[in-house]
Design a protein with these regions (language model features):
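Hydrophobic alpha-helical bundles in membrane proteins
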Residues: 15-239
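Basic, Lys/Arg-rich alpha-helical nucleic-acid-recognition elements, primarily the DNA-binding modules
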Residues: 1-13
Length: 239
């Protein structure tokens, strides 16, 4: 009897369906994640960066020396925002279609073939140092992103400089998010194959039980927000 089967019986899950994962499947899954991780991170970064042009042009339109009308600033800024969001959504869809084949890795119980766990552990050990480095860079960028904003508050009250500081904040957050998403995607894939960290069988089953109530909660919260906002027409406060 394999170790995976013993573990399955020990956890009292013999009646649950278990997906078999061969060495070939594990390697293919890791290759797909390696291919999509950077692209997904880049798309996420584009979403965060998308309003920067709109914000900057809006601030520049308030400055007479830039000779940019509000309509031109809004038109160009919104066009850039839509294009960047469209590119990001396209990337998300392509990556989602590529990884859909193995989406059960995150939510369902799996049983790996002989040698798979050892192979994945070796890859995870080799990736640990780059993972920590990227995570530290990402978190540091996110923490430091508020420095331009508070620095500007300390030395100037100009709206233009404040908007510029917000744009710098978004840029640093985007860079940090890129490193965090990229590194986390690869590490999570290996943890999924090993059923460790956030992907143990117990946590998978707990997440399944919680998914229904969480969805209901957000639907109710959204309905209350929209009803309140439409009723009072006080959108600048209800959010």
């Amino acid at each position: 009897e394999s170790a995976a089967s013993k573990r399955k019986k020990k956890e009292g899950e013999s009646d649950r369906s278990v997906h078999k994962v061969t060495m070939e499947m594990a390697n293919e899954y890791l290759q797909i994640i390696d291919w999509s991780a950077g692209k997904t991170a880049f798309a996420t970064m584009l979403c965060i960066l998308s309003p920067i042009v709109l914000l900057m042009l809006g601030a520049m339109s308030e400055m007479p020396n830039y000779h940019i009308s509000e309509n031109a600033a809004a038109g160009i800024g919104i066009c850039v925002l839509i294009v960047l969001i469209a590119i990001a959504v396209t990337i998300f869809i392509l990556c989602g279609m590529k990884t859909k084949k193995y989406e059960y890795m995150e939510k369902e119980d799996i049983e790996t073939a002989y040698g798979v766990s050892g192979m994945v552990k070796e890859k995870r050990d080799a990736y640990h140092s780059p993972y920590v480095t990227q995570l530290v860079i990402g978190i540091t960028c996110c923490i430091c992103s508020v420095i331009p904003l508070f620095g500007t508050l300390a030395v100037s009250e100009s709206d233009f400089y404040m908007v510029s500081a917000v744009c710098m904040l978004l840029t640093l957050v985007a860079i940090g998010t890129y490193f965090i998403v990229r590194s986390a995607a690869k590490m999570n894939a290996m943890n999924q194959l090993l059923e460790e960290e956030d992907y143990t069988r117990q946590k998978k089953h707990e997440n399944k039980k919680m998914s229904g109530p969480v969805m209901v909660y957000w639907l109710i919260a959204t309905a209350i927000y929209l009803a309140w906002s439409f009723t009072t027409n006080d959108w600048d406060r209800t959010w």
